[in-house]
Amino acid sequence: MESSRTAATSTNGTEKSRRRNTDYLQIDPSSTFINNTGRGFAEELPENFLDTISPHPITPSASTSSATSATEEPATSSAPQLASLAPMSMSSEQPSSSFSSASLLSSSYETIKNEPEFSGSTAGLLSPLHVDSRRRESHDFNTSPYIKEEEDLDGSHLLMGGIRPDTPTNDRSTDLGSISSLLNEDHHTNTIGQSPSPRSTFGSDPTPMIQRQLIKNEDGVSPGSMGFSKNHQGYQKPRNGDRMEYEKAPYQRNSRKQKKPLGLLNQALSSVISTPTISSSNIPTPPSAHIAQPRRIYSTQDSNDPLNAEIGDDIYIDTKDLCKRIAFELKNHSIPQAIFAERILCRSQGTLSDLLRNPKPWNKLKSGRETFRRMYNWVAQPLATRLAILDMKTEDVNRASGMSPPTPAQNVRTHRRSTSDHDGPVSKRPRLVFTDIQKRTLQAIFKETQRPSREMQQTIAEHLRLDLSTVANFFMNARRRSRLGGNIDEPTPFQQVKNISPPPVGDTSDALLNGDDHVPLLNTVMAEMYKEGAIATSNHSAEQREMIERGFGVSIPGPSHSGELLNGDSHEDDEELDELNDSELAYEEDVEIGDEEEEDEEQANGDILPTPKVEELEEKTVIKEEAPDDGEYGATKLAAN
């Protein structure tokens, strides 16, 4: 350095003033960059360093003239790269600095940002240039970057011992040419979509650029970025026209002691492109997210459930009596069939309704015994336990016992009726009823073969004028009925019959409504009425006999005999009326059932008693013959003769 300055004093005054403002680039990576010029281990640049940059022939001793020629004679350059070599005026404010900046850099070195590295990573230590960002009073500050005089880097020279100026840039840095073009433009035209690198973000003037972005997008600033702008007031400086000036805060002068957080760059970037965040407390909770009460699970595999008590094969249960008892319990305690089917049987309401109407025999059930077993175990429990299993309280049952609510099936029917009334008549498929000929023909064929072929079913359908599906359904239903055997079931000798507790005796009104009980109960009531009438008539005849014996009324030579005669006549008349009524009813039924051809066939088969037509004709003729017994007919006949 001293020899180069001594050689420079031999030139003219113009060159002296220019030399004072211009120093030559010499990089010593092992230096601590403290104002100490007495270091003897400073390493100079190679002799061919400028040859690799500029095509001009430059000698190490004539480095000053090369800088002058590069400045004054750009037209003589044969390479277009010289157009990018702009002079870099250096400030004379630092005469004691050992290392200053120079303008003899290519476009790639010219675009390196003047940025002090505050992070502790090795990216900043490996960069070839560190540009000072402190304020300069030179009028060429905006156009001439200068090399920074580093302060207090401590032992960083140990990491940079063998590095030469031709060391490639770190992978984290972006293209220097694109960064240069970005910084030369107006800061207001910067695009937000570009992702800045750590080096391009904190350049020669990083803070005003971030400040402009914050001002430009202050409507979309997130709370985190607002905190960043408040906490770092040292970076916010006013603008003086196009020239941006700022000073270091006192706490920033020591670059080693004052470090920036690693996430500062991400915060600055997110402040530009971030959108307002939505607080989770403001988001309404969906209805499905609310915690519902745990629903009770009804399972047929739970061993703790009393309804799953095992019933051995040596036990016989009369399913018909059991279904009658279940129907009585449902009616008496106003228990909907849907609830009972779901919570007791774990089945649907339609399955329960079908079982109550047509209970299957116990000995012909295999897997279906489980349903009747749960029914039996439920009936065997006390009333409070039965209602507790159904999740129903006794008070609710007593309050609802006045009028039972309609079951879901009834509600469905009511809804269908209401919709049909509003929407018009609903096309419902009428139920098919076989005629007698069709029924007897199908039954006769079924006795011969229970599984006719498809062709035979088609022939039967064409002959009887039926659909093929109807014929197929008939044979399928007939096979099912034959397997059931008419639901005739009796316990085997080794089975023990489990008695079903019958309903209370006093509840006859409810028993009359339980389907199959209606007909036998009606017959019983009618039989009692006839019995009372017979007793009344017998008592009345005894009183008459007593009165006659005491002398009341006309005496009859044989009162008992006359009474027997009278009673006998009356009984005979009653028998005749009964026979006549029976014959008339039979005749009417025959007329309703079929045509004359069918009647002839039935008479030939002997299925029906002889028709009373002849007797009626004979009676009518007899009546006609007995009509002129008054003598008028004979008198008129004699007069005519």
Curated annotation (Swiss-Prot):
Amino acid composition bias (Polar residues), ranges on this chain: 1-14, 28-38, 167-183, 190-204
Biased composition (Low complexity): 52-79
Ranges of Basic and acidic residues composition bias in the record: 131-140, 613-626
Gene Ontology annotations for the cellular component aspect, listed alphabetically: nucleus
Residue spans of biased composition, Acidic residues class: 571-604
Subcellular location, record wording: Nucleus
Annotation: DNA-binding region: 308-394, 427-486
UniProt-listed InterPro entries: CUT_dom (IPR003350), CUT_Homeobox (IPR051649), HD (IPR001356), Homeodomain-like_sf (IPR009057), Lambda_DNA-bd_dom_sf (IPR010982)
UniProt protein name: Homeobox protein ceh-38
Gene that specifies this protein: ceh-38
